[in-house]
Amino acid sequence: MTYLAPALARIHPDWEAVLDQAAVAARLAEIDRLLVLQQQDGKTLFPPPPQVFNALAFAAPADVKVVILGQDPYHGDGEAMGLSFSVPDGARVPPSLRNIYKELAADLGLGVPASGDLTHWAQQGVLLLNSVLTVERDKAGSHGKLGWQTVSDALIDAVNRDNPGCVFLLWGNWAQTKAERIDASRHLVLTAAHPSPLSASRGFHGCRHFSQVNAWLIARGRQPVRWATAPAAQSCLF
């Protein structure tokens, strides 16, 4: 590996066996080759190479509490950081995340965080996973055909198989196609419209997923997620 080597060096060791599966490893090698070629052509790719597998840096598959699936990284400068829906501290909060925060506030009565950095969720076992893990600058969906789905599906399968019970939040039609990979007899699967401004009013707002997640975890003897640990300052969102 060349382009992906810095990112692979940062993952939790329990994910290594998943990425070492023959089909997954072969796909990763091909993705790595294509990313190197794009980089050599002068294309700017996001997220930065060390952050491509940021979602896998915090918890083993067996320790994940919640999976929040995204589609592909943000394609603007200074936005993508390897966690679905998350942006670095100081970056403008994107519209979909703004709606996630609004629902979080309405559901739990908490203040709206000023920062769009969701690292504090990841540190508690929230797997913020995009299906496609890279993108070319200013070209949404540009890496959708590189084969990343083989990799991300294997990661979902590992959580489904190895985790004693977690919650999958499937927001939007695309994420809901992954429901067939999840054993709903062991895991809780919650679905809603995507938080994008185009669809949030059609079933995302009012879904109360955050309180449902914690009630389910507590009932099974697991620690709830501290959804709001960053300073709240709603005026910073707009």
From Swiss-Prot:
Enzyme active site: 72 (proton acceptor)
Q: What catalytic activity is recorded? A: Hydrolyzes single-stranded DNA or mismatched double-stranded DNA and polynucleotides, releasing free uracil
Tell me the Pfam families matching this sequence.
Answer: UDG
Q: Which UniProt keywords apply?
A: Cytoplasm, DNA damage, DNA repair, Hydrolase
Q: Which InterPro entries match?
A: UDG_fam1, Ura-DNA_Glyclase_AS, Uracil-DNA_glycosylase-like, Uracil-DNA_glycosylase-like_sf
- Give the top-level enzyme category: hydrolase
GO cellular component assignments: cytoplasm
Give a short account of what the protein does: Excises uracil residues from the DNA which can arise as a result of misincorporation of dUMP residues by DNA polymerase or due to deamination of cytosine.
Give the family per the record: Belongs to the uracil-DNA glycosylase (UDG) superfamily. UNG family.
Name the record gives this protein: Uracil-DNA glycosylase
Q: Lineage from the top down?
A: Bacteria, Pseudomonadati, Pseudomonadota, Betaproteobacteria, Neisseriales
